[in-house]
């Protein structure tokens, strides 16, 4: 049984406490206040219930009513405190009854009970109120840490994780932590104090009865553990299914045009219903098991009261070691201690659900940041000479076969300052990977990428990326205004700077014609704009950043002829005086590059100007001729 209790009750509680140790320290002052108010609430509760004994004795004339001998002096020993305090309390009540009346004494004691209850409930409220800043603050901190970690992780992490799964952890899992773990904070800080004070009171009333009561706690705890044993595993499965659901929603939103084009609404609805129903079935089992906590603890608590009432009756009727009003006070205190124990049992069902979600959150929080500054990195503020790929090989890990798959093999390339280098080749030849290595989105397995002779791994990541501007095939815009998107990389830019950048990017005209000009919102991912407009806003953003190095990744491949002309014109303005590395699908857009490198299966197989490569009649000319057809 000891091993079972350790695995089913103490192990989850240990994990729970470890989570609190991670997140509670900033809120220690609230924790201290909560403990203080909980102690005050427990003491006041004991005194308010203690008032029941004289009330019962007066009301029912037990043993002839209030009975006391003469006033007793305390002899200084701890063992006599209870006897002296009880005797003198009864003595003063008896004197009050003689001087006034029993009914007035009953009223005074009743008012005392009401006053103590008022103070107790006030302390109880304050103890709960001081927990709320801890609870909400921890959830906020988890979300902040999760978001900060997402922005810190390398791109390689997200190539192996579904966006919907990450969103599910950010939303559903954090919410489950709040509902399951943080809702148990009050229980953790309040109930141990209540149980301790009530337990001491029970011992003071009758140690024999308390010893008898303790014998029933382990089997009751074991019985509760049986019900909650599988809850954590089921909750983990439920949250995984919730991630599948969110991933499918995200996938559907991204592919809605294709779904409609192929009349696949019914198919997608069926797929979603399958995933959603699986989640519903699993979470239903979890919730049913969780809902057993209250009735189970209520039933076991009632059994305990009945057993104690039977044994207490023996002590009253057969041995006379305790009187009737005192046994009632004992039962009231026992019931008061059962309620916190019920909360513990309820938490034993709630906490495993939250722990399962926290495990999923920690998969992100504890993920290793692969791209980070080394200790004492070199700082760079300008680009003076050249970019160099020196014997660079890059591979990604095929987790299915547990092997490296090389995308680039022994790449050697020098890009002098002010020159434009174009990378061409079939899909999968490694063009975009080469671009990603310059700002160090990934680290190479072999060789090195150098900026002005310094390995990018030795540079501060922030300094390196400040030198680089990006314009991609898909313009990445945010759900904000034109102004906020253009100044995204330079928050201190003036309105004049933003307007000038928009003019150079051929975006000024359509921006100023919009409803609120530069303050007009562009919708989610720039959804209110055409493809060409989105790309020109993206170019304006790069112009405003004014980087010495420019990376273009098929910036015009998805545009119509008119939009391509406007964007190409904007790009040519942007490329002036800058070092540019461009990937192009349409070879016509890179004819004027200083050097064109042709990649095939991860290697540079040809290099030269457009005219030189056409004359060679090699791989580049084949690509060129195919586009002329």
Question: Where are each of the predicted segments found?
Answer:
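Helix-loop-helix
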Residues: 201-215, 289-359, 364-365
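Transmembrane helices of ABC transporter permease
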Residues: 33-40, 186-237, 310-323, 339
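Juxtamembrane helix-loop junctions of ABC transporter transmembrane domains
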Residues: 45-53, 112-163, 167, 171, ...
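An intracellular "coupling" helix at the cytosolic face of ABC transporter transmembrane type-1 domains
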Residues: 25-29, 155-156, 172-181, 185, ...
């Amino acid at each position: 049984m000891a091993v079972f209790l350790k695995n089913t009750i103490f192990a989850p509680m240990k994990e729970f406490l470890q989570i609190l140790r991670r997140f509670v320290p900033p809120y220690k002052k609230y924790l201290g206040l909560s403990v203080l108010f909980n102690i005050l609430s427990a003491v006041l509760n004991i005194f308010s219930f203690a008032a029941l004994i004289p009330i019962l004795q007066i009301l029912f004339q037990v043993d002839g009513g209030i009975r006391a001998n003469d006033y007793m002096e305390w002899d200084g020993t701890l063992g006599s405190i209870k006897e002296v305090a009880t005797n003198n309390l009864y003595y003063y009540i008896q004197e009050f009854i003689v001087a006034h009346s029993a009914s007035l004494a009953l009223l005074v004691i009743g008012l005392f009970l009401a006053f103590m209850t008022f103070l107790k409930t006030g302390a109880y409220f304050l103890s709960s109120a001081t927990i709320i800043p801890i609870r909400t603050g921890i959830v906020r901190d988890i979300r902040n840490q999760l978001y900060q970690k997402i922005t810190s992780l390398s791109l390689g992490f997200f190539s192996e994780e579904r966006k919907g799964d990450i969103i599910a952890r950010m939303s559903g899992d954090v919410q489950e932590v709040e509902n399951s773990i943080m809702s148990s904070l009050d229980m953790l800080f309040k109930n141990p104090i209540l149980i301790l004070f009530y337990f001491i009171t029970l011992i003071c009333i009758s140690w024999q009865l308390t010893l008898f009561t303790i014998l029933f706690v382990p089997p009751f705890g074991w019985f509760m553990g049986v019900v909650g044993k599988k809850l954590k595993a089921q909750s983990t499965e439920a949250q995984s299914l919730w991630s599948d659901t969110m991933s499918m929603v995200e996938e559907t939103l991204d592919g809605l045009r294709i779904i409609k084009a192929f009349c696949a609404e019914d198919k997608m609805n069926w797929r979603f219903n399958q995933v959603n129903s699986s989640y519903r079935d699993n979470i239903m089992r979890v919730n049913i098991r969780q809902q057993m906590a209250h009735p189970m603890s209520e039933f076991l608590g009632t059994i305990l009261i009945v057993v104690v009432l039977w044994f207490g009756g023996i002590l009253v009727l057969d041995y006379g070691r305790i009187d009737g009003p005192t046994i009632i006070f004992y039962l009231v205190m026992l019931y008061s201690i059962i309620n916190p124990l019920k909360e513990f049992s309820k938490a034993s069902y709630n906490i495993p659900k939250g722990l399962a979600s926290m495990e999923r959150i920690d998969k992100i929080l504890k993920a290793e940041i692969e791209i980070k500054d080394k200790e004492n990195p070199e700082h760079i503020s300008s680009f003076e000479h050249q970019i160099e790929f020196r014997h660079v090989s890059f591979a990604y890990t095929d987790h299915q076969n547990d092997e490296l798959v090389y995308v680039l093999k022994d790449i050697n390339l020098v890009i002098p300052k002010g020159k434009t280098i174009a990378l061409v080749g079939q899909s999968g030849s490694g063009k975009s990977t080469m671009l990603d290595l310059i700002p160090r989105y990934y680290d190479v397995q072999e060789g090195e990428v150098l900026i002005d002779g310094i390995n990018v791994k030795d540079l501060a990541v922030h300094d390196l990326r400040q030198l680089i501007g990006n314009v991609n095939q898909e313009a990445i815009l945010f759900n904000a205004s034109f102004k906020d998107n253009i100044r995204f990389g330079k928050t201190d830019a003036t309105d004049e700077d933003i307007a000038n950048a928009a003019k150079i990017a051929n975006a000024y005209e359509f921006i100023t014609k919009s409803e609120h000009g530069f303050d007009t919102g562009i919708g989610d991912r720039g959804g209110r704009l055409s493809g060409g407009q989105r790309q020109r806003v993206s170019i304006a953003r790069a112009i405003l950043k004014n980087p010495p190095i420019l990376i273009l990744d098929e910036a015009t491949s998805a545009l119509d002829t008119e939009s391509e002309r406007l964007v190409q014109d904007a790009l040519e303005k942007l490329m002036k005086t800058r070092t540019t590395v461009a990937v192009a699908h349409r070879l016509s857009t890179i004819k004027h590059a200083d050097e064109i490198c042709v990649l095939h299966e991860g290697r540079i197989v040809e290099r030269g100007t457009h005219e030189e490569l056409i004359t060679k009649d090699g791989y580049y000319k084949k690509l060129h001729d195919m586009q002329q057809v």
